[in-house]
């Protein structure tokens, strides 16, 4: 990997993350590498400025923070093919980050990158767009929205807790009409987040699939479903004349869905690329440790396993 121009995004409002980002930027600049540095958070989005002001291809994005910081970076940078190197600095759960122990902004780290001493983990992204008219109308009326974890269609009203009726089609075929709090379309990466909280399936990130999970459906027969990755999920809001139904990308508001509109959700053309330094990184170990599965807190001796 060449290191000529590097993005450093840190968790907005977190002094630990900012201090680590400043140290990292100083180390890179001392090697003649052009650095673009900025905070990322609910009120800070540096990525459009980074992309617009780049004078040459961006080789790497270093993300210092928690999962929310990583999700924002993936949404904005994956379509440009910029790899992400993420560390849990100032974050909480850190499901999508490497431990801070691996963040040592010294010559050894940069030498590893230059010598390609890392693994590349590709994670599916989702793309969503709004459409009007019949299902045969494939021309979008909105920009394309991206998500690493999930796209969620659910209502949001300022003065009441709303339920909604959503019709879901897969590749033009009606699957169900859900009455409840909403619908989640998730990648395998996102299956351990909102989908898991809604009692949906946990899908290994090495599996190419989409998971569709209703949120608090009023019918006990409305169940989660796992579908092929090339499927197009179309969601139509029904039974309302107000634009209270919203599209959410990784928990961030994307847009309102007006009556008569539908949202099409599919696998994005380009995945997010994560650089992995931990040679012992294991999805199953992350499940045990981050989700506190019983294996992490209950220890029985298995004398049958060699």
Curated annotation (Swiss-Prot):
Give the domain of life: Bacteria
A GO biological-process term: NAD metabolic process
Report the cofactors: a divalent metal cation
Binding-site residues, NAD(+) = 67-68, 149-150, 181
Q: Which reaction does it catalyse?
A: NAD(+) + ATP = ADP + NADP(+) + H(+)
Q: Name one GO molecular function term.
A: metal ion binding
User: What's a Pfam family in this record?
Assistant: NAD_kinase_C
> Which cysteines in this chain are paired by disulphide bridges?
none
Q: Name one GO cellular component term.
A: cytoplasm
Q: What is its main location?
A: cytoplasm
Keywords (A to Z) from UniProt: ATP-binding, Cytoplasm, Kinase, NAD, NADP, Nucleotide-binding, Transferase
Enzyme active site: 67 (proton acceptor)
Under Enzyme Commission nomenclature, its number is 2.7.1.23
Q: What does this protein do?
A: Involved in the regulation of the intracellular balance of NAD and NADP, and is a key enzyme in the biosynthesis of NADP. Catalyzes specifically the phosphorylation on 2'-hydroxyl of the adenosine moiety of NAD to yield NADP.
NCBIfam families linked: PRK02645.1 (NF002731)
Q: Which family is this protein grouped under?
A: Belongs to the NAD kinase family.
Q: What is this protein called?
A: NAD kinase 1
């Amino acid at each position: 990997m060449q290191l000529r121009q590097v993005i450093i995004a840190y968790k907005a409002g977190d002094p630990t993350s900012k201090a680590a980002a400043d140290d990292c930027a100083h180390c890179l600049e001392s090697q003649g590498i052009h650095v673009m540095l900025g905070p990322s958070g609910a009120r800070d989005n540096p990525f459009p400025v980074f992309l617009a002001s780049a004078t040459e291809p961006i080789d790497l994005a270093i993300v210092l923070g928690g999962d929310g910081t990583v999700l924002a970076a993936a949404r904005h940078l994956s379509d440009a093919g910029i790899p992400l190197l993420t560390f849990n600095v100032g974050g909480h759960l850190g499901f999508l980050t490497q431990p801070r122990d691996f963040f040592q902004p010294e010559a050894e780290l940069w030498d590893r990158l230059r010598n390609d001493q890392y693994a590349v983990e590709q994670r599916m992204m989702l793309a969503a767009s709004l459409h009007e008219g019949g299902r045969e109308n494939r021309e979008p009326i909105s920009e394309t929205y991206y998500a690493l974890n999930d796209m969620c269609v659910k209502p949001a009203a300022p003065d009441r807790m709303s339920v909604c009726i959503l019709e879901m089609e897969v590749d033009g075929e009606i699957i169900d009409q859900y009455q409840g709090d909403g619908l989640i379309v998730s990648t395998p990466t996102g299956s351990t987040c909102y989908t898991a909280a809604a009692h949906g399936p946990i899908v290994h990130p090495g599996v190419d699939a989409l998971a569709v999970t209703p949120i608090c459906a009023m019918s006990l027969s409305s169940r989660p479903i796992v579908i092929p990755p090339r499927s197009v999920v179309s969601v139509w809001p029904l039974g309302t004349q107000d634009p209270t139904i919203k599209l959410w990308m990784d928990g961030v508001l994307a847009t309102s869905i007006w009556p008569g509109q539908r949202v099409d959700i599919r696998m994005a053309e380009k995945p997010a690329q994560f650089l992995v330094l931990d040679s012992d990184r294991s999805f199953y170990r992350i499940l045990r440790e981050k989700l506190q599965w019983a294996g992490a807190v209950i220890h029985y001796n298995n004398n049958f396993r060699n």
